[in-house]
Amino acid sequence: MNRDQLHKKIDSFNDELINLRRHIHEHPELSGLENQTAILISGFLKDIGWNVRESIGRTGVIADFGPLDKGIIGLRVDMDALPIFEETKLSFSSKVDGVMHACGHDLHISIGLGVAKIIKDLKLNFGTRIIFQPAEEIASGARWMIKDGATNGLTHILGVHVYPDLSVGTIGIKEGSLTAAAGELNVEIKGKSGHGARPHEGVDAIWAASKVISGIQESITRKLDPLDPVVITFGKINGGNAFNVLAEKVNLIGTVRCTNRKVFQNIGTWLNENITSLANSCGAEAKVMFREITPAVNNNACLLYTSPSPRDS
């Protein structure tokens, strides 16, 4: 099949994939609960002749095609939605209150199923496995699937993610680290409660927390190599009980992102030292808990430059 024939083949079922994507968008499912999505995927793949295995990594689906003894190339597709209320007013908006495909996984599923239709007709001399992964948004599904053997036998694995900042028909590629490693940061600031009119008799945990929030951002710019950037964002803060009482305790929850593996491996220790120091400067104590969630995506140079042919879909 030459390129023109390939494009005609894609065009022949493009409307089918668009309708499929919109159906998935209307019926989103949260991480680990992708049961109906998995049924839809499995049925589609079985109908076009793929060997399908279900309930891999809980709600995941994997499908094989071609001569698996000649090496297997994998394509990974995520399929969970987010706990977000959709307000787009699209004709195919989410029909599930508080759940939305806001990260593009509905598109990823459609892309994966479209690839499955094409591969069936290419007569490749190696095997192909498409991995439909659950629970990407809670950074758990990949581990579940690996534990259940989803990657066994793979020689290479490919992936894709839609990116709204790129024009339609454009593919963004980069050698080495692309998306950053992710970690979860929990900080408990402990002070000493007291009356708001007599702050000198207590230790204001909210003041200490504000020092931590602003101070850690300043520390990043002065103490870490700017060529290996680190992003720290506190997304949740909780503390205090009354408007006129010093807060005894404040909890901060945030995320840490970094593309350099060595920096990421050491960032937990760095955060503990610097956050503790900032809290201590206010007379407070800090308990710092850092958890690595996912490593950075590292693009292999040998697979990267393969002359992709983008299509407007």
Predicted regions and their residues:
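Acidic/His- and Gly-rich active-site-bordering loop/insert found
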Residues: 2-101, 106, 110, 114-125
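Divalent metal-coordination and catalytic microenvironments
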Residues: 24, 75, 105, 145, ...
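Flexible, glycine/charged-enriched surface loops at secondary-structure junctions
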Residues: 34, 220-231, 278-290
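A short beta-alpha structural unit
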Residues: 60-62, 233-237, 286-304
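Histidine/acidic-residue-rich, glycine-tolerant segments that coordinate divalent metal ions
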Residues: 62, 82-84, 89-100, 106-107, ...
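A conserved active-site cap/scaffold subdomain adjacent to cofactor or substrate pockets
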Residues: 245-260, 264-267
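Oxyanion-binding "anion nests"
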Residues: 263-280
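Single conserved hydrophobic/aromatic residue that forms the stacking wall/gate
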Residues: 305-313
